[in-house]
């Protein structure tokens, strides 16, 4: 086969995104929560998911830890079921290159959910601006809502729900974002949440207000 595309072509579907959004009663979009580990991304995203679900909005939450259990499993996780060679080839670790691929895959999945008319909530450290921008560039303008959960490192270390900062400070793990690997804060996020001073529930309400203001959901939602 000499075709550079590998014979892969996009298959048009008879049910369009607009059809699905009309059926759902709201627009699809990606709400991309980014911030340091322990900043409150997952907590706030989960609250937003719950509030939207209660309002009858069709959503799906993609969480960094959960995705690492399957789609973006580590080499050691895959090796247990498929063998070491398979794990090395397809598993994702935490190098800069692997983190880039982690976010690329998530962006592609999120884009598919948007085409289904869903509001996709993603909670990932996603430390590199170029990777977040790459996801944004694949979506229609206005569909990517970057939410910076702006929590100081000191507070994140105090929370340290997974014990990662303690391990990083002790030299037990390397490549910890905020310690020995950089976090590039968003330059122009659609929304900034001060999770260090504002309760998570109030932060979640701020996200819902933004979605209403942008007419992604109805004012009454």
Named regions from a protein language model:
Residues 1-30:
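Extreme N-terminal, non-catalytic leader segments
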Residues 33:
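Hydrophobic anchor at the beta1->P-loop junction of P-loop NTPases
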Residues 41:
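Conserved lysine of the Walker
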Residues 87-142, 165-166:
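Glycine-rich phosphate-binding loop used to anchor ATP phosphates in small-molecule kinases
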